[in-house]
Amino acid sequence: MKKIKIKFVDFNVGLGFKLEDNEIVNSLSKYYDVEICDDPDYIFYSVFGLDHLKYDCVRIFYTGECYTPDFNECDYAMGYDRLSFGDRYLRLALYRLFRFRKSYEKIINRPPFDMAYVSKKTGFCNFVYSNCFAQSVRARFFDMLSAYKRIESGGRYKNNIGGPVADKLAFQEKTKFTIAFENTSYAGYSTEKIVEAFAAGTVPIYYGDPQISQDFDTNAFVNVHDYRSLEDVIKRVQEIDNNDELYLQMLNTPPIKNPMDTSDLDAFLKNIFDQEYQKAFRRPRSHTSTDMEIFKRRYRLLEKYFFKYTRKVKNTLIRIKKGTLLWS
């Protein structure tokens, strides 16, 4: 079995990412003797830092954030964009990986709901967010829909139940609808928000990827992008809320159009690691790309010793201004 030396850098381990136990490592371990070390031949990196610039080896980028890969810095990438770039790119949404994979698998073959399940719902709609830096449309919709009925807000942002919830899905399950708005709207960018709303047995009210209908059946949720205004979205939600038969029909519509396993990830990684090492490089080695990396490495020092701290203070002040809970 071929031995490969890899390392993960610039990932946000605070969000539950496990360096030695994740879909990437598990996929590679099927075919290779994987060593995670500090002198790698290959690195996997994400958007939470610039440490990847220290490694002049094969670079494989992954993002769970709304960020298009820079193919001048990476040899290969996995992300949200619906694009084709030879063997250098794989579209791999966040909800198919890490701790979110369980919710995705849960809704692939979920049992049908009945009217008794609908009758158990004790709340109208939920809103679970701690990020107050998203596009304003999310907060605006919360306020507009709240004029119709109370929305249970269980995150740190706009919390109205006395504190953040410990179990998000259990909290969501009590309500009929979930406000599943991404931080921003961008073609291809869809995260765990819609998947967790389905997994909790609710009807998502979704905003984010204008092309979401390519991945999920719009008969199973309210797609904000299908309506001319937020007022029209609210009218549709009211219609569903007042028609239990229609609501149950939406609950029982299979949400995922083309359920996917990890075989595409396996094939993508095998193509990279089965090659001779020197032939696996893809990124340009021009004077321009080299100069840009030098510039970013200099910026990295400013980020490490200055900008990181000023941004933290600024963001804390914004959270306080917007009423976001800073602790449980």
What is the predicted role of each segment?
Residues 2-61, 67-152, 161-180, 187-328:
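Pol beta-like nucleotidyltransferase catalytic core
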